[in-house]
Curated annotation (Swiss-Prot):
Gene Ontology CC entries for this record: Cdc48p-Npl4p-Vms1p AAA ATPase complex; Doa10p ubiquitin ligase complex; Hrd1p ubiquitin ligase ERAD-L complex; nuclear membrane; perinuclear region of cytoplasm; replisome; RQC complex; VCP-NPL4-UFD1 AAA ATPase complex
Similarity field: Belongs to the NPL4 family.
The encoding gene: NPL4
Biological processes per GO annotation: cytoplasm protein quality control by the ubiquitin-proteasome system; DNA replication termination; endosome to plasma membrane protein transport; mitochondria-associated ubiquitin-dependent protein catabolic process; mitotic spindle disassembly; mRNA transport; nonfunctional rRNA decay; positive regulation of protein localization to nucleus
Full protein name: Nuclear protein localization protein 4
């Protein structure tokens, strides 16, 4: 045996492999899907390079894309490079090409109708690419709420008057009197505004992400957090829990107070709406739950603000107790929602009572919710998150066409002075994502949320919460096994109008109060109709309209007259 020949053969093989390795190049592509890399040699045909790129992008046909070696350049179509190799095009290791989808792209797509449950417009129509969702140039085409369309046309700049620091004439402007952006932190602190409005937040992110002078590089400013593990990882390993990698596992979660809120203010159209709702507790001592129906309007007390105007509270079937509520099956839910839709009303939130008499016999109640206890309990936070998930906010500023929710939670409880007062809240987008991923659950301590452990297909990443300590420094704390619910809460203001102009009247028996002896029947309807002064105002009662539709004695044309 000739060991020298074997050694020489081994050296030749090594040099051949090493030479081929040195010829291998990496060509980078900046695509709408992100940065992608393709291996090639100088002799590789550019068409083969594009085939590998198409596989990574999930695109079988790249004829609708252009390629350029300069950003923001129109570039050339893929057909231009037919028959050319990497060397012919002068491409070297590490070179980058910019890939742009042409405006006249006709990639195969199907149109899916996504029904929005009750919170925004009825239907969202959005093209969905069968090969995967591709970011588009410009805002997503969806049907938003009217208030969102109105606020999208406003810049929200905060005007300031000429101050003592100004040294110019009446027609001049300087840094002390120039308009402020709608998200200005100093303005919020000066005026006691805890959270910026949703549209101010969108404008702030747009300012950071998008160049208003270059519409072709548009990036949607909003993206909902997703803490689910990806069970279809592109790396090729077995799905979790059999396999996991950095591409499919969710990132580390850091919770902090949300800077913005989807709704800034809750306005009850008339105090009688809330009084009728609280009367159940006043007469029986049991708690009550209801769905608030109303509309969304511009709120001018906050830059680009939104307020929810509550016109009625519908009480679904429930079993009330002195310390809680059990919701029962709601058989006519779809009918109630259809009636509300006919009346141009939305389910804007829920309301529930948590009242305990103080025993002083002066009408005061105990103050159980304050900064030293909790404002919403852990179970109520989970409930609010689930309702918000069921009522998504439709927006053109997100690739998915959805972002968080405008659904609010109002709890009627005791104030610091023993008075009965409503308090309105929402939970953050992080709370919604944590509930979707089944990461959090309730605990025996109302002010704390418990973090679940990884089990089955549920993967729980590291969770931290960030707060400012007594020295003004930001400190991160491990959230496991439990963390305060305050990090998921968003507070709203609420009030009654000074000059109320409610859409509906009061007086008809409210539904599902049989246990109080208040029945919705023909006798109650007869008494209510006879109490009408003769101007038909009795038809302006939400509970009565729902009862009429439930009876089924009116035809479609007659019901339409009632709705009108």
């Amino acid at each position: 045996m000739c060991y020298f020949c074997d050694f020489a053969s081994l050296r030749v093989s090594y040099f051949i492999i090493n030479f081929k390795f040195q010829l291998t190049q990496i060509i980078r592509f900046r695509t709408p899907s992100g940065m992608l890399r393709v291996n090639a040699t100088p002799e590789t045909a550019f068409n083969d390079l594009l085939n590998d790129l198409g596989n990574q992008m999930g695109e079988s046909d790249l004829s609708s894309f252009t390629f350029s070696d300069k950003p923001n350049d129109k570039g050339s179509s893929a057909n231009t490079f037919h028959g050319k190799s990497v060397a012919d095009l002068g491409l070297k290791h590490g070179d980058m090409l910019y890939v742009t989808r042409t405006a006249t792209s006709s990639s195969p797509a199907v149109t899916a109708s996504v029904n929005e449950p009750k919170s925004g417009s009825a239907v969202v129509t959005k093209p969905i690419n069968t090969a995967g969702i591709i970011p588009i140039h410009g805002p997503t085409k969806v049907k938003q709420l009217e208030v969102d369309d109105v606020l999208d046309t406003q810049d929200g700049m905060i005007k300031r008057k000429k101050s003592n620091l100004c040294r110019h004439g009446e027609k001049g402007m300087c840094e002390y009197c120039s308009p402020l952006p709608s998200w200005d932190k100093g303005y919020r602190e000066e005026n006691g505004i805890k959270h910026m409005s949703f549209h101010a937040y969108v404008n702030q992110i747009n300012e950071q992400k998008n160049n208003r002078n270059n519409s072709t590089s548009y990036m949607s400013p909003l993206e909902e957090p997703d803490y689910n593990v990806n069970l279809n990882c592109p790396s090729g390993h077995a799905p979790y829990p059999k396999g996991i990698c950095s591409k499919c596992q969710p990132p580390v979660i850091t919770l902090q107070q949300q800077q913005f809120r989807m709704v800034d203010h809750v306005e009850f159209a008339d105090s009688g709406i809330l009084n009728d709702f609280i009367d159940v507790w006043r007469q029986t001592g049991v708690q009550r739950f209801g769905f608030m129906f109303g509309r969304y309007e511009v709120f001018d007390k906050v830059p680009l603000g939104i307020k929810a105007v509550v016109e009625a509270i519908y009480e679904p079937p429930q079993a009330g107790e002195t310390d809680g509520i059990t919701l029962l099956p709601w058989e006519n839910q779809e009918l109630v929602l259809k009636v509300a839709e006919k009346l141009n009303l939305y389910p804007v939130g829920i309301a529930f009572t948590d009242l305990t008499d103080s025993g002083a016999r002066n009408g005061t109640v105990l103050c159980k919710r304050h900064k030293d206890t909790y404002f919403l309990s852990c179970l109520e936070v989970l409930m609010a998150a689930r309702f918000q998930i069921e009522h998504p906010n439709i927006t053109k500023h997100s690739n998915s066409g959805r972002f968080s929710s405008k659904f609010v939670t109002c709890v009627v409880s005791g104030g610091l002075e023993g008075e009965i007062e409503p308090r309105s809240f929402q939970v953050s987008t992080n709370a919604e994502a944590l509930v979707r991923a089944d990461i959090i659950t309730g605990s025996t301590q109302p002010s704390m949320l418990y973090i679940n452990s990884s089990q089955g297909k549920r993967y729980v990443p590291d969770v931290f919460y960030s707060k400012i300590n007594e020295y003004g420094l930001e400190v991160k704390t491990n959230a496991k096994p439990a963390f305060p619910v305050d990090f998921l809460l968003v507070t709203l203001s609420d009030a009654f109008p000074l000059n109320p102009t409610p859409r509906f009247t009061n007086g008809f028996t409210i539904e599902n109060r049989d246990f109080m002896g208040n029945l919705q029947d023909l006798r109650a309807a007869y008494r209510y109709i006879n109490s009408d002064p003769g101007n038909g105002s009795c038809l302006s009662n939400f509970h009565f309209i729902v009862y009429l539709v439930t009876l089924g004695i009116l035809g479609d044309s007659e019901l339409q007259m009632v709705f009108d």
